[in-house]
């Protein structure tokens, strides 16, 4: 139960921290600044079905934000990858920022681990497109 409440609290913080002013800088891939293409940092494909092409500032690993782009290089979501061990330890996140701007809806799902974030974690996906447009990254 505490884990669920932790995930819900993190989601609330993330939605409230969406920064519309920064949205213009990350609207199209590749984003500027310290962001690097995830596929150039770890062994992952350039485009992940269901997620898109990911960019991250390596200093923010493992949590992110990861910026996800569709095939037309348009930002579709901001993803945070929150390790279970941090949720269980009731870690506080008060400095997470969602640079992608307005959030349409949120998805949360478990992941057992993958290159880049090998430990079990939750993906918290802040979608910047309507639910019907999630298909832009389906394949």
Which sequence ranges carry the predicted segments?
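N-terminal short leaders/motifs
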Residues: 4, 17, 24-26
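Bacterial N-terminal signal peptides
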Residues: 8-17
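Metal-centered catalytic cores of metalloenzymes
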Residues: 22-139
